[in-house]
């Protein structure tokens, strides 16, 4: 939905229990409607994902700098972490929040720095074992990326 304030989108994705989403990482990012940066549905069956996105562009310095921000909040329901058949990588249910800011520096045409702030919060009950949450949920991740497009 496009409004004067920005662009809104709501996406839902369902992977049935009889199937499993398999996508080699070499192929790049997943092309699912519910995709969020630093999120993977690969290896999941019986999976639900609901994601709300808000995109806004605004001027910071009229002649020098524009920003584009994308905020996304997603809720991802996964099978039990102990069910290796349906949940290949033992990923628990989680809430995923991203803030992605792109800097458009007008005087440097092809340079597009990006700041990505990500948080994943584990939801539900899962065994108190680091294999089920370490580098998967209950984390905060910050990236500063230098994009240069030729």
Which residues does each predicted region cover?
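Transmembrane beta-strands of outer-membrane beta-barrel pores
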Residues: 3, 12-18, 29, 58, ...
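Short loop/turn motifs that connect adjacent beta-strands in outer-membrane beta-barrel proteins
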Residues: 4-5, 59-67, 105-113
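Membrane-embedded beta-strand positions of outer-membrane beta-barrel proteins
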Residues: 8-10, 54, 67-71, 101, ...
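Transmembrane beta-barrel architecture of outer-membrane proteins
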Residues: 12-14, 48-50, 73-75, 93-97, ...
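Outer-membrane beta-barrel translocator domains and adjoining extracellular loop/strand segments
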Residues: 20-26, 79-87, 125-132
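Flexible internal linker/loop segments at domain or repeat junctions
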Residues: 22-44
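Outer-membrane beta-barrel "beta-signal"
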Residues: 52, 136-150
């Amino acid at each position: 939905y496009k409004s004067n304030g920005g662009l809104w989108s709501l996406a839902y994705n369902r992977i049935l229990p009889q199937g499993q989403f398999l996508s080699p990482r070499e192929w790049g990012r997943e092309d699912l409607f519910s995709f969020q940066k630093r999120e993977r549905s690969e290896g999941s069956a019986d999976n639900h994902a609901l994601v709300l996105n808000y995109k806004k562009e605004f001027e910071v310095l009229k002649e020098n700098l524009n920003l584009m921000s994308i905020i996304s909040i997603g809720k991802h329901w996964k099978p039990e972490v102990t069910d290796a058949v349906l949940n290949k990588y033992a990923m628990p249910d989680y809430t995923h929040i991203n803030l992605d800011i792109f800097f458009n520096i007008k005087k440097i045409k092809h340079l597009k720095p990006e700041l990505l702030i990500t948080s994943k919060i584990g939801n539900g009950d899962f065994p108190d074992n680091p294999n089920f949450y370490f580098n998967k949920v209950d984390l905060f991740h910050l990236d500063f990326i230098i994009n240069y497009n030729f």
